[in-house]
């Protein structure tokens, strides 16, 4: 089977101050390489993108995709506000203990997993992947919910970066890349 058939979900959890500058860029390089060979990667964890979303917006292939990305981010922020959640309470206590100080730190690490590829599609939660290349998927940062969304969208593998470690697994093979140096 050709590598061009591969659909890989990109996820992180238990991030620390170094995983965003070590493991996440490594996954981004993998994503770029897979896409150059005709494969597909899917980036999720929308709240983790807050603060770095313009990096992804500027990589959208079309104005329509740009607008869908804006809506993806804004709809999540509106959801948080509707239910009294603060959009700036990220990073988590574990992230902070590991050295991430702001949502900007965490967001810049999150978007690194998408490499430098053009955004080809924006998907609703669990919507099947339709296009080759990099897609953005609506899902929260929660490991269980986001990874299951990736699996439901058709990803056959999830690359999961972590600095602090996690026992998490999901319905599709989950390769953990742990880095804290």
Q: Which residues does each predicted region cover?
A:
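Active-site cavity-forming subdomains of large catalytic enzyme subunits
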Residues: 1
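Anaerobic metallocofactor- and corrinoid-dependent redox/one-carbon enzyme cores
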Residues: 5, 10-12, 16-181
């Amino acid at each position: 089977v050709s590598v061009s058939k591969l659909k890989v979900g990109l996820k992180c959890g238990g991030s620390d101050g170094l995983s965003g500058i070590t493991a996440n860029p490594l996954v981004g390089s993998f994503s770029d390489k897979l896409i150059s060979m005709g494969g597909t990667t899917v980036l999720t964890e929308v709240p983790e993108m807050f603060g770095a979303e313009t990096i992804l917006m500027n990589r959208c292939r079309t104005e329509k995709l740009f607008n869908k990305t804006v809506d993806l981010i804004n709809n999540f922020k509106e959801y948080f506000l509707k239910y009294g959640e603060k959009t700036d309470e990220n990073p988590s206590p574990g992230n902070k203990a590991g050295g991430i100080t702001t949502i900007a730190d965490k967001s810049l690490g999150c978007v690194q997993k998408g490499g430098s590829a053009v955004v080809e599609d924006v998907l609703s939660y669990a919507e099947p992947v339709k296009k080759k290349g990099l897609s953005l998927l609506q899902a929260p940062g929660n490991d269980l919910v986001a990874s299951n969304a990736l699996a439901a969208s058709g990803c056959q593998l999830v690359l999961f970066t972590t600095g602090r470690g996690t026992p998490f697994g999901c319905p599709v093979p989950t390769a953990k890349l742990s880095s804290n140096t």
